Amino acid sequence: MYMDKKMDSGDIISQRSINIDDNMILDDLYYKLSILGRDLLIDTLPSILNGTNNRIKQNEEEVTYGLNITKEEELINFNDSVSNVHNKIRGLSSIPGAYAMLNNKRMKIYLSEKTNNISKEKPGTITDINKNIKTIN
């Protein structure tokens, strides 16, 4: 992005997109974006250096800003939808990590998997411990 006086408002130098599948975690996305960014830089740098790069004006209606994530936002609400819980966990893995409270201690949760298992337990109840992997319904 070309620099401008306002935050994140400059013209776009070049852009590419990537598909994010339903189970991709933050670390996987970071790696894929680093490769994509490297390739984009290699492809775009010559046009910047020789002055032929076509600036793309940003559509101000599509601009978004990333905000700092608070500890409260890291807390998993097991009464939320399965998709929202899963997306929070994978979006916050490995840093800062989503968490739940267990016996008044913060338990970081880095991975999740959606299943079709139906439980009669209250959401967030640990129902199985297998090889140090805790299953939470």
Enumerate the language-model features and the residues they cover.
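A diffuse structural propensity rather than consistent per-protein peaks
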Residues: 25, 70, 124-127
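An anion-binding loop in the catalytic cleft
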Residues: 79-137
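Donor/substrate-binding cores of folate-linked one-carbon enzymes
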Residues: 1-65, 72
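Sequence-level motif detector for i,i+2 pairs with an aromatic at +2
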Residues: 9-10, 71-73, 104, 133
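Acyl-group handling in specialized metabolite and lipid biosynthesis
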Residues: 67-80
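Generic alpha-helical secondary structure signal
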Residues: 34-35, 69, 82, 103
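Charge-rich, low-complexity amphipathic helices
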Residues: 51, 63, 67, 106-114
